[in-house]
Amino acid sequence: MESPTHPKPSKDKTLSWNLVFLVGILFTIDIGMANPSPHQVYNVTWTITNLVTGTKANATSMLGTLTDAFPTMYFDLCDIIGNTWNPSDQEPFPGYGCDQPMRRWQQRNTPFYVCPGHANRKQCGGPQDGFCAVWGCETTGETYWRPTSSWDYITVKKGVTQGIYQCSGGGWCGPCYDKAVHSSTTGASEGGRCNPLILQFTQKGRQTSWDGPKSWGLRLYRSGYDPIALFSVSRQVMTITPPQAMGPNLVLPDQKPPSRQSQIESRVTPHHSQGNGGTPGITLVNASIAPLSTPVTPASPKRIGTGDRLINLVQGTYLALNATDPNRTKDCWLCLVSRPPYYEGIAILGNYSNQTNPPPSCLSIPQHKLTISEVSGQGLCIGTVPKTHQALCNETQQGHTGAHYLAAPNGTYWACNTGLTPCISMAVLNWTSDFCVLIELWPRVTYHQPEYVYTHFAKAARFRREPISLTVALMLGGLTVGGIAAGVGTGTKALIETAQFRQLQMAMHTDIQALEESISALEKSLTSLSEVVLQNRRGLDILFLQEGGLCAALKEECCFYADHTGLVRDNMAKLRERLKQRQQLFDSQQGWFEGWFNKSPWFTTLISSIMGPLLILLLILLFGPCILNRLVQFVKDRISVVQALILTQQYQQIKQYDPDRP
């Protein structure tokens, strides 16, 4: 740091006065956030406090992230001085102080310098020295040598106050007069504030952790003793909508069956739209869905239980699927998986909105980092994308400079390296070297044909091979932004315009919020059992539905039956009914002989045990006599041959002689 050309002696910089009562103020703890999402928008309040009197010189609130919420703060020098600079009236022309308009006016032209107290430098002294015991401790101010610093957190400069300080009649007027005391004086201001100061945060201050207030000392540069003023800067971070505590333990308070009042009858009747195009529409009966022209808001602040939350998730999936291709929902089973991931993302191309102030979507970012472990497809990427993830990018943008907020289109999210968010801050993105992919978020719901489910629950289930399971993400991916629809979504308008898709989005938002609240409850819970239970929270939720008969357990999935009448609530009863119908149809197609094996459980075992010996005995009775006769005849023939051989051994053959031959 550059020292002044004509420094004053160090003895002019010292003053022995006790400020022990400031210790309690200097160690005030700020509100901290445990593992927040870097794109989370908070209500950030910055406060400048007079450490001698404890009064606030300035309090500025703004919405923003912890990376870009650093406003420019304006305050008056007398707000951090109070009455501590009021010199004796016998001192000739002191030229400073805040008790009189003339002193406030003369103080305007006096240079000042500021020294940090958070640096803990021994040579700079303590509060009694204004942290400026020796030259070189100053880091900012308004003096002829212009002190600067590369490591301090703030800069303090003089501001400009508009007004006329000397009236035409020779009298004095202007903002240095307090209008509460001099109400008839022209240009008088509130409190006589005519020494404005401007505080700005440096790049180092934007990167530091403001987990507590930080103090500085301000001193006037004048001949003789330099008066001292002490002030602190602190940050208070509050969520936009503070969470409400419910019950002694927040880990499992919502595991309860669906309420009868909130059950949704999802009966739909197809009709043709009256508008141009003639696309078929859907009419909902008793469905708690907001109209298309009004935003979706919860019907009541009452917390919904596990049954309502998960069934609403499947209900929204069914409505979205039925709106795109009703042929798929004639007879099907929609299954929730019990193992993570519970959601999957489809990378898409879309037009995001670029705003300088946080949009409403930025105010609903979860406080914790939620990870999407499965993202497929190719879409829009922003930031520095590593080579391992470039396969997800069809288009890559470097983003924007400055404090901008990029809001994802309705129904989409940004899947960032730091977590899932509907809105990203470019200040955070540039500072952390993060990258984000624009995705559609879909619940992990699998689609099964009824034959597969019924065969699995049949008593004699046989599988040649595992059937291919389709997920809703593959069937509906790409519909929210009006792009090319995958799977069954071809030929329909964008789901973003339908109430069915809005209900699905509302159900997903409620479920994600419940998962995030469970994480928060786990952080605050002191019960070890709840920590073990929450590790498989979704598995417990699905088990709860299975035990209540609300869904059918298929391997590690919780399945709900759906047809054109809607989503069935009592799925186990529906499963038993369909299995009974399937068995009756199977019995009607069997013959009388095949039916014997289904009448008694022991009959099949008995038949299979004695059938072998009976067949052997029957074969012996049928073919035994023939075989025995052939064997006896063979023996007789052999005996005859032996007898002939014996006779030939006892006699000799006589030679025959022909007399006609010589």
Curated annotation (Swiss-Prot):
Extracellular topological segments: 35-606
Name of the protein in question: Envelope glycoprotein
Chain positions of site Cleavage: 465-466, 645-646
Signal peptide: 1-34
Organism of origin: Feline sarcoma virus (strain Gardner-Arnstein)
UniProt-annotated stretches for the region Disordered: 245-279
Spans through the membrane: 607-627
Pfam families, per database record: TLV_coat (PF00429)
UniProt-annotated glycosylation sites, renumbered to this chain: 43, 58, 286, 322, 327, 351, 354, 394, 410, 430
Function: The surface protein (SU) attaches the virus to the host cell by binding to its receptor. This interaction triggers the refolding of the transmembrane protein (TM) and is thought to activate its fusogenic potential by unmasking its fusion peptide. Fusion occurs at the host cell plasma membrane. The transmembrane protein (TM) acts as a class I viral fusion protein. Under the current model, the protein has at least 3 conformational states: pre-fusion native state, pre-hairpin intermediate state, and post-fusion hairpin state. During viral and target cell membrane fusion, the coiled coil regions (heptad repeats) assume a trimer-of-hairpins structure, positioning the fusion peptide in close proximity to the C-terminal region of the ectodomain. The formation of this structure appears to drive apposition and subsequent fusion of viral and target cell membranes.
UniProt keyword terms in alphabetical order: Cleavage on pair of basic residues, Coiled coil, Disulfide bond, Fusion of virus membrane with host cell membrane, Fusion of virus membrane with host membrane, Glycoprotein, Host cell membrane, Host membrane, Host-virus interaction, Lipoprotein, Membrane, Palmitate, Signal, Transmembrane, Transmembrane helix, Viral attachment to host cell, Viral envelope protein, Viral penetration into host cytoplasm, Virion, Virus entry into host cell
